């Protein structure tokens, strides 16, 4: 017999070699029906796997991330099987689960067309109806290589050869289809009830542009048709809110072929950017930060000292000046460190908070560039805090409170993740443990729930990541707090302590927006271009009914302009309906209509975005309410 402990701490006895699915059936018929995979002592297993050891046992459904990944990965295999049936000469590369779906990379004899997706979907439906069992088996390295060589699967042969010695080489079979895979997978193809193939894209083999370009087919899948319908509706809404589309329509920014990944901000886009930066500056001033500006290009010696040359070089751009190597900065921290190091500091000055809206450049492959969300140059709202060890917790809590204030202004909910030491890192185990525990203590004292994100910290320290949730329920990683004991050591940073001796300060790296460009992209999609009044590029448009109302319209325009309102005057010889519709299309918060009655009464007819006609108002009353709305950032 074996003992299995369940998530509710209940322990039960079972016969040895019972399968995970059989365990599920003893718990609940519904759970057995919905379960997709299981785990024993933290290791994910197929439902068909026999359990021969005691330990902690858990089942996963589509409600769990683990269940979603298994379902989507099985869907990728389903698609690959359909492709091989329809296009037998196609070679298989890789097909993982990804956030919200799956993909598979293929090397077809002839390029796939959008029409082919319909054929592939139809074949997938047939395979689902066949309800083929999905079975795991193992081969030796030589057997695995021979198996794929005989099938002409050159990419799979390469993958097998790269598997380290001593690692088990597992496969999954469903009907005539076999794929190299660690698993786990759902028990049969009949589980994969609802799916949709979305699009075809190019992808280099192994992400290396020196390799062959393959065709990647993306798809989504769900256990119920209703869930698929809901998701496709969500995609339609997301398309309407695409910041690239809205940015073009509202003339906010553009992306030019002369500079892929380098966005151009237009006058209206600069209004949004400047408002965000002005707000950022004022809040940081009140929170005790001092703003600095550091150079974009610094020499190789600096980046070697900081560790970026060894750990981040593939993401950097380089140039030569007077035969010396220089790099365009990918991060602001070394520049901030040089500002700190420029003079001697006393413990009485701490904490020292240096903030910078710094332009950074990072090398991104052209295939991953995406509007403002993934670019090659962006402005990072960095700050670096130098402090005494005993000030660490209070400073982290202070940064958390500042980030919370920013996000709540825009109506964002968020969750927090604590990212720990990555494989490619610098520093001792002791310093990493000290830094990680300091972040945990601050989060717990602040009462913020968090989840651990293993191995996703920066190379110089662990970090807290803030993930925003937008109006469509999507999450975006923006704010970050990183605790760093490494850089002060690398740059020999010191302060004079109370004892008159030199000591090493502790350093925090933190951002609120993250990338200003990316945050603007998120805001465009969150608001669908209908920004709150204080952020809107044009806050009011004055619309005249006829030629004779032009003088009064100009008077209203001038009064608003003199009060600092961003205002436009539309006195064109067009119909009033046309001018109102155009103002609505441009998502202007307030349209003021002026005609005979308004001139007579010294009023304006107000139309508010999203509300409609508010009727006539005395102009003095309207401007008082408008200025209050702007001032209070409502």
Curated annotation (Swiss-Prot):
User: What is the first-listed, main subcellular location in coarse terms?
Assistant: cytoplasm
Q: List residues binding Zn(2+).
A: 333, 384, 509
Asked if the keyword Iron belongs to this entry, the reply reads no
The entry's free-text remark on the cofactor is: Binds 1 zinc ion per subunit.
What does the subunit section of this Swiss-Prot or TrEMBL entry state? Homodimer.
The protein's name is Threonine--tRNA ligase
What this chain does, per the entry, is described as: Catalyzes the attachment of threonine to tRNA(Thr) in a two-step reaction: L-threonine is first activated by ATP to form Thr-AMP and then transferred to the acceptor end of tRNA(Thr). Also edits incorrectly charged L-seryl-tRNA(Thr).
Please state every residue range assigned to the domain named TGS: 1-61
What GO terms describe the biological role, i.e. biological process, of this protein?
threonyl-tRNA aminoacylation
Entry GO terms, CC: cytoplasm
The first-level EC class reads ligase
The record's subcellular locations are: Cytoplasm
**CDD domains per the record?**
TGS_ThrRS, ThrRS_anticodon, ThrRS_core
Catalysed reaction equations from the record: tRNA(Thr) + L-threonine + ATP = L-threonyl-tRNA(Thr) + AMP + diphosphate + H(+)
- What InterPro entries does UniProt report for this protein, alphabetically? aa-tRNA-synt_IIb, aa-tRNA-synth_II, aa-tRNA-synth_II/BPL/LPL, Anticodon-bd, Anticodon-bd_dom_sf, Beta-grasp_dom_sf, TGS, TGS-like
The coenzyme or cofactor needed here is: Zn(2+)
The record's comment on protein family reads: Belongs to the class-II aminoacyl-tRNA synthetase family.
Write down the EC number. Answer: 6.1.1.3
Domain of life here? Bacteria
Tell me which UniProt keywords the record has, alphabetically. Aminoacyl-tRNA synthetase, ATP-binding, Cytoplasm, Ligase, Metal-binding, Nucleotide-binding, Protein biosynthesis, RNA-binding, tRNA-binding, Zinc
Ranges for region Catalytic = 242-532
Report the GO molecular function annotations: ATP binding; catalytic activity, acting on a protein; metal ion binding; threonine-tRNA ligase activity; transferase activity; tRNA binding
